[in-house]
Amino acid sequence: MEKAVKQEIMEKYARHEGDTGSPEVQIALLTTRINHLNEHLKIHKKDHHSRRGLLMMVGKRRGLLNYLIKQDIERYRAIIKALNLRK
């Protein structure tokens, strides 16, 4: 992922200026990487090493979403809606 794209995502989902580690930012960055890797795997169906990486990223995102549910359900609902994810 390019630095400019990453910076744009961080600015969009940051809770305050300079925020790079909040769950919302991490989830948004993972979602972007997951979507990019999904497109790659549509073309390269036998790339099982990348598929494993994709599954690990999906699991990590799921963990962050579960954390967000426990901490603040409204923030969870907002990020789900903003990123157009399933519940």
From Swiss-Prot:
Function field: One of the primary rRNA binding proteins, it binds directly to 16S rRNA where it helps nucleate assembly of the platform of the 30S subunit by binding and bridging several RNA helices of the 16S rRNA.
Family the UniProt entry places it in: Belongs to the universal ribosomal protein uS15 family.
Listed CDD domains: Ribosomal_S15p_S13e
BP terms from Gene Ontology: translation
Higher taxonomy: Bacteria, Bacillati, Bacillota, Clostridia, Eubacteriales
GO MF, one annotated term: rRNA binding
Pfam families: Ribosomal_S15
Signal peptide region: none
SUPFAM superfamilies, per the entry: S15/NS1 RNA-binding domain
Superkingdom, natural source: Bacteria
GO cellular component: cytosolic small ribosomal subunit
The gene coding this protein: rpsO
Keywords: Ribonucleoprotein, Ribosomal protein, RNA-binding, rRNA-binding
Protein name: Small ribosomal subunit protein uS15
PANTHER family referenced in this protein's UniProt entry, alphabetically: RIBOSOMAL PROTEIN S15, BACTERIAL AND ORGANELLAR, SMALL RIBOSOMAL SUBUNIT PROTEIN US15M
Subunit structure comment from the entry: Part of the 30S ribosomal subunit. Forms a bridge to the 50S subunit in the 70S ribosome, contacting the 23S rRNA.
Origin species: Clostridium kluyveri (strain ATCC 8527 / DSM 555 / NBRC 12016 / NCIMB 10680 / K1)
Matches recorded under InterPro entries: Ribosomal_uS15, Ribosomal_uS15_bac-type, uS15_NS1_RNA-bd_sf
